[in-house]
Amino acid sequence: MRYRSTRSEEKISAPQALLQGLAKDGGLYVPEMLPVPFIEYNSLKDLSYKELASFVLKRFLTDIPENDLKKLTDAAYTGTFDAKEIVPVKRMTDAFSVAEMFYVRTWAFKDLALSLFPYLLVWA
């Protein structure tokens, strides 16, 4: 998959976007297209956090072989968080669930993304 700047038509690969960070024109890199295949969402509900992360990321980081991506997500999320599930989700009602973010170091979602980012940079 190619990535393009939000301020120009500059296009680069995912590894280049990871390493470069911002585009030369100061824009952000976004996917050239959104990979929105038909997904049976019920098939995702029983995946672990690592499995779900790999499932989503392989659609956006097509330059990374699937086996490598699984190894990267496994390394990033194994032994890093206090909960076995990484982010436990507690069902409050049939229509409402809450992610228990207090199991991550700063109690914020950024811990999830930033745990994987260094592994992606090393791979790139």
Where do the PLM segments sit?
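PLP-dependent amino-acid enzyme catalytic core
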Residues: 1-124
